[in-house]
């Protein structure tokens, strides 16, 4: 029952994210002139403090490989993984997992501007997901994105670099953020 509920929740949020959040992710932003502050975990956060452990690094690497495998199946070039983009993605996943921000694309423009401090970009997009109760949460997230037209559009976009951040909260919910960047 818990796995079925998790699948329903992922499906609902994937659909909602595809309808309400991803369209805005295709805006082209100018690189900022001033540095922006980055998000951090609030004190006493319910986010697992193991966000830099091997578990999350392995999940992030797996999502990257799955996305590139999907892109290859569509005759698209692979995306390079960038640690600076992954850091911004990870901070957003941590903020969602802790409840600091709702499950959403809130703050996307600020994340992209922060990335733009070190990576000049022409366009950017973002996918988010969350799930619980699966032995393969990374695969569930990617499959959900593939089934969602808005998320799939981001995966198939003319981007060349990406970052992925995954964390899990005390309830066992995994939160995923993937930012796509087209460098100038």
Give the positions of each predicted feature.
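Short, surface-exposed glycine/acidic/tryptophan-bearing loops
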Residues: 87-135
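N-terminal targeting leaders of exported, membrane, and organelle-targeted proteins
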Residues: 1-102, 136-139, 157-184
């Amino acid at each position: 029952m818990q796995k079925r509920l998790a699948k329903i929740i992922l499906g609902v949020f994937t659909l909602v994210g595809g309808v309400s959040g991803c369209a805005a992710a295709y805006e082209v932003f100018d690189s900022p002139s001033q540095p922006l502050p980055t998000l951090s975990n609030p004190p006493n956060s319910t986010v697992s403090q193991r966000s830099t452990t091997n578990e999350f690094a392995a999940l992030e690497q797996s999502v990257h490989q799955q996305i590139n495998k999907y892109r290859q199946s569509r005759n698209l070039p692979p995306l390079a993984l960038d640690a600076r983009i992954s850091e911004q993605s990870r901070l957003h996943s941590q903020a969602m997992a802790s409840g600091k921000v709702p499950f959403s694309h809130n703050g996307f423009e600020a994340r992209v501007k922060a990335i733009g401090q070190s990576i000049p970009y022409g366009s950017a997009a973002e996918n988010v997901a969350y799930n619980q109760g699966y032995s393969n949460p990374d695969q569930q997230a990617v499959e959900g994105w593939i089934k969602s037209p808005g998320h799939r559009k981001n995966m198939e976009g003319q981007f060349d670099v990406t970052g992925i951040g995954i964390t899990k909260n005390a309830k066992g919910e995994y939160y995923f953020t993937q930012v796509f960047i087209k460098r100038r």
